[in-house]
Amino acid sequence: MTKETSINPELPEESKAWFQNHGLFSDHFLKERLPEWKEWQVGKEFSDFRANLLALYESKKSILINMNESQTEKEFIQPVLNLLSYANSYIVQTDTKSGVKVNHPDYALYPDQVSKDKSYTAEGINYQNALGIADAKYWERPLDLSKSNERDTFSNVNPSFQIINYLTGTQKNWGILTNGRLWRLYSLKANSHLANYYEIDIVQLLLEAPDSASKYFYLFFRKQALLAGIDGKTFLDHVLDGSNDYAIELEINIKERAYQVVEYLCHGFSASYLPSELTPENLKDIYDNSLILLYRLLFVFYAEARELLPLSTNKSCRENYSLFKIAKDIAVITQSGNTLSLKSTIYYSKINSLFSLINTGDKSLNVPEYNGGLFSPQEHPFLDSHAIVDFFLVPAIQHLSRVYDSKRRQTFAVDYKTLSER
């Protein structure tokens, strides 16, 4: 067996994501590939936008918490839309004579004032030439809950359901949902219209993040993001295409690596046998259980990426018991070039402990019990009675946890969240 030589050993520091991407795009694409696009290279227009947005927030933050939906729109959301180049090019849904809004999106977004003015008809607003739609809620209103509050225009309505209904009704591909602080993008092009979205916390961006991180708001929510180019596609369309292309590339890469991972695992289990013991029956056991171990590892990588295991909500779980932490430690070991033991089974013990925790669950760590049998020692006793030494297991996990990005010419953590959504 030969060690992999095609991967650049450099281990870049994983950059913090100043966005919440729920399967709409690829995290890796957003963090590593998008900054190489020419659209990312914005200058004074961006710095002016950020300065104006910060000034707007600072001037309104003390009163926003007490405003109702209509007041939030007038005092904050509409000024933000103006900063995003939508001034004079959006239609605001008006109230009926009874003072209640009809069931249409709050905003229809147009490429210019001429297109906007042509969209007023006797039957109502014509959305045919609209770039997209937007819906607004009062400051910090939960966007995934139905609730009744006097600050709401509509009572007991789930805003995320609402925006999807509006997108479907208007047949627009892109929609914005905001409570002033959180800004979300939804798309009819997503695999799951409701579950997949892209979210920015503008307060966090303005007060905690580097200035450049605000590009993740500016580039994605400004009017130019919805304007089609000569190819008929918008900036958001291209980001979605780039994310999908990366996901396909990654899926092919992981499938190819799986064969080599099984080879590592088979060699690892075989090492505990005498040559005379490697009978056809034992070799079949080794191969079958190497596949089971591969499935376990992939299951946990996917589960952690999708927050089915509490990585972001439980620090103890993340730092002491997760495959994320094991893989992170292994990446450092691999990059340092340290010799791996042919006797130690430290890492096998670590993953087996994690598998046991998943099988039984752990309320103290908020880990739910998995009763599908994959992690059951009764169904797979071989994996409890055998072990793989670090020399074989460490590179196997490294192959599943880090991947070479041909465009960046570096290795990065595998974006399993992207794979899990496709």
Regions from the language model: what does each represent?
Residues 145, 185-190, 303, 311-313:
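A short acidic (Asp/Glu
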Residues 181-183:
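Loop/turn residues immediately N-terminal
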Residues 1-174, 189-192, 235, 239, ...:
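A short, conserved, highly charged catalytic patch centered on acidic carboxylates
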Residues 98, 103, 188-189, 205, ...:
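Charge-rich, low-complexity amphipathic helices
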Residues 1-67, 138, 197-422:
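Preference for the N-terminal adenyl/adenosyl cofactor-binding alpha/beta module
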